From Swiss-Prot:
Coiled coil: none annotated. One of its GO terms (molecular function) is RNA binding. It catalyses: uridine(55) in tRNA = pseudouridine(55) in tRNA. GO terms for biological process: mRNA pseudouridine synthesis; tRNA modification; tRNA pseudouridine synthesis. PANTHER family: PSEUDOURIDYLATE SYNTHASE TRUB1 (PTHR13767:SF2), TRNA-PSEUDOURIDINE SYNTHASE (PTHR13767). The active site is at 39 (nucleophile). It comes from Bacillus subtilis (strain 168). Keywords: Isomerase, tRNA processing. SUPFAM superfamilies: Pseudouridine synthase. This is tRNA pseudouridine synthase B. Pfam families: TruB_C_2, TruB_N. It comes from the Bacteria. NCBIfam families: TruB.
Length: 309
């Protein structure tokens, strides 16, 4: 049984759910889940949790994402990307330069509000926005706070008749729509715009050069070497503070017991999480401050129980 994180190089044309279903069939297990939706037309890093690792999906989903994006100035679309129908056009002047673009990109760094596109899976009143959009109904969309950690121009500006395009890289918080970011960039430059290409190059610490294609995963499955190529749960959680405990405490953790907060974690707040490890290096659980009992830690997830060892 595989227990870990598969780093998939998601191909264009598949939904994230399609990828999960294919891996379930490939590995003959239902315990498979992805860690952050990628639109069908977007390729790149898609971490897939398998086996016990499905318990840590939420902790990987929270990580920042990095994208390589292309924006086309000159016309906007219904979907904010290259798949939609044209909404507005405006010929692009050839005097737009790198300095203009870099100034706009730098202005986007930090926290800001973003309204998700109508063609998205965000739910309003229990229904996905794209379902409203396909029915020709526009609804009020909830604003969300996002963080642009870094953004930079990576190519020259290329002019194509009445349009222009350039590429940029962006590292952003979960839930950021790069399509919408492209539209914002266009607005700040004075032009209708859309995202014409997107690839996710990193998800947290996982990069594209670590990922495997479906063909490679199928070959690993046939040779019985999938486990050798998965990221262990312990590495996947290396962004969390680590607490190494004694074998005596480990037995309590396996049973989901409350633990006294050690001195080094006395400043933890309610939103903090720590990964609890055995002396031999196995991650047993994730703990957080007990909401009602000061000085105690409560298990958020028990990853390894005695029966599984």
């Amino acid at each position: 049984m595989v227990n870990g994180v598969l780093l998939l190089h998601k191909p264009v044309g598949m939904t994230s759910h399609d990828c999960v279903m294919k891996i379930r069939k490939l590995l003959k297990t239902k315990k498979v889940g992805h860690t952050g939706t990628l639109d069908p037309e977007v390729s790149g890093v898609l971490p897939i949790c398998v086996g016990r690792a499905t318990k840590i999906v939420e902790y990987l989903t929270e990580k920042s994402k990095t994208y390589d994006a292309e924006i086309t100035l000159g016309f906007s679309t219904t979907t904010e990307d290259q798949t939609g129908e044209t909404v507005e056009t405006k010929p692009v002047n050839h005097d737009i330069d790198k300095a203009d673009v870099e100034k706009v990109l730098n202005s986007l760094k930090g926290k800001q509000e973003q309204i998700p596109p109508m063609y998205s899976a965000v739910k309003v009143n229990g229904k996905k926005l794209y379902e409203y959009a396909r029915a020709g109904i526009e609804v009020e969309r909830p604003k969300r706070m996002i963080t642009i950690e870094d953004i930079a121009l990576t190519t020259e500006i290329k002019h194509h008749g009445e349009t222009a395009s350039f590429r940029f890289t962006v590292t952003c918080s979960k839930g950021t729509y790069v399509r919408t970011l492209a539209v914002m960039i266009g607005e700040k430059l004075g032009y209708p715009a859309h995202m014409s290409h997107l690839i996710r190059t990193a998800s947290g610490d996982f990069s594209l050069d670590e990922c495997f294609t479906f063909d490679e995963l199928e070959a690993q499955a046939q040779s019985g070497t999938v486990e050798e190529h998965t990221v262990p749960i312990e590495r996947a959680l290396n962004h969390l503070p680590k607490w190494i405990i004694s074998d005596t405490l480990a037995k309590k953790v396996e049973n989901g017991a409350l633990l006294e907060t050690p001195e080094q974690f006395s400043e933890m707040t309610s939103g903090d999480r720590i990964a609890v490890f055995t002396e031999s290096g196995t991650c047993l659980a994730i703990y957080f401050p007990h909401p009602a009992k000061k000085g105690l830690l409560k298990p958020a997830k028990v990853l390894m129980q005695k029966s599984e060892q």
